[in-house]
Structure formats: C-alpha cells, structure tokens
C-alpha cells in the first residue's frame, strides 16, 4: 500500500507495464530497454509503484477497497512514482517492528530494509496510522548518501 503524504505536485505521470509481479508501495526499477517495471532486487529504490483502481466487473457497482489493488501481476499497467528528496510517503512494504525512526533504508527484494552499508535514498520516520487499519511506515526521500 502507498500513501503520498508530502509530495511535489504536477510531476510527469509515467504509466508502464510490469515484467513481473509487484506490490503497491514497493520500490521498483524501470528496465530502460523494454520500458517495463519490476521490484528493486537490490539498490536505492528511488521509484515507487502505485496501482490504479479499476472500476470494471463487480467494482463497477460496488466501491472497491484499497486492498483490492495491492498486487499487480506481470503485464499490468502501473503508475511509476518518481520520488524527489524531501518527499514523504507511507508504505506497507517494510517491517515496522524492526525499524526505528531515523534508520536509513535500502531496497532489497521489493521491500525497504535497514541500510547497514552501501548507498541509501530513504529514512524511516515512524509508524503511519492509516484510517483503513493497514500497517504502514513513513519514509522520507533524502539525498543519496552512503550508510556506515
């Protein structure tokens, strides 16, 4: 899940197809050759995934819930969120039980984890109290720096 808490408005919107399954709020990479998206296996994760709600089938008559659009299979169009330093997001793609406010974050396996060495682009800022009850943590995009 992803919530855009403090972001720069009117950024260009990039909609791309996934080459593998991704989760909403996950750090992603864009393949420059075929312009597809996959979760960040190991790196900075400076781009985030957002999955737009679709109002087809049952969702045409019943308002879908947030969790109805948590996962995107391969070949699904997703919105690529280009993050900028200073922006704040809330995401479910981290383990809030193992992190403390101020921890530096890297992307590994499509999730945010504590950076112990190497470069990082995010800081953990604590738990986000989402009105839907989804367990989320606040992250702030920072200038790229080296941990350790």
What is each stretch, according to the model?
Residues 1-148:
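Surface-exposed, low-hydrophobicity beta-strand/loop segments enriched in small/polar/acidic residues
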């Amino acid at each position: 899940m992803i919530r855009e808490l403090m972001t720069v408005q009117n950024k260009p919107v990039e909609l791309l197809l996934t080459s593998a399954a991704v989760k909403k709020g996950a750090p992603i990479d864009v393949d420059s050759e075929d312009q597809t998206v996959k979760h960040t296996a190991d790196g900075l994760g400076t781009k985030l995934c957002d999955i737009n709600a679709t109002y087809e089938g049952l969702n045409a008559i019943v308002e879908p819930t947030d969790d109805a659009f948590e996962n995107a299979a391969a070949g699904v169009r997703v919105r690529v969120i280009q993050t900028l330093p200073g922006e704040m997001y809330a995401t479910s793609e981290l383990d809030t039980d193992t992190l403390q406010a101020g921890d530096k974050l890297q992307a590994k396996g499509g999730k945010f984890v504590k950076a112990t060495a190497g470069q990082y682009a995010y800081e953990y800022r604590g738990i986000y109290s989402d009105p839907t009850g989804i367990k989320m943590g606040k992250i702030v995009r920072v200038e790229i720096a080296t941990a350790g």
